[in-house]
Amino acid sequence: MNLEVIAQPIVLGLIVASGPLVIVSLAARRGNL
């Protein structure tokens, strides 16, 4: 098993999961929540 084949889905998953978290954290810092 190639590491690239395993790493690509993990990286994509982290990017998709971190997207909303970054937006929420930025909104929390601005006091919009």
Curated annotation (Swiss-Prot):
One of its GO terms (cellular component) is thylakoid membrane. The chain crosses the membrane at residues 5-25. Pfam families: PSII_Ycf12 (PF05969). It is found in: Plastid membrane. Keywords: Membrane, Photosynthesis, Photosystem II, Plastid, Transmembrane, Transmembrane helix. A core subunit of photosystem II (PSII), probably helps stabilize the reaction center. Belongs to the Psb30/Ycf12 family. This is Photosystem II reaction center protein Psb30. It comes from Aneura mirabilis. The lineage of its organism: Eukaryota, Viridiplantae, Streptophyta, Embryophyta, Marchantiophyta. The gene is psb30.
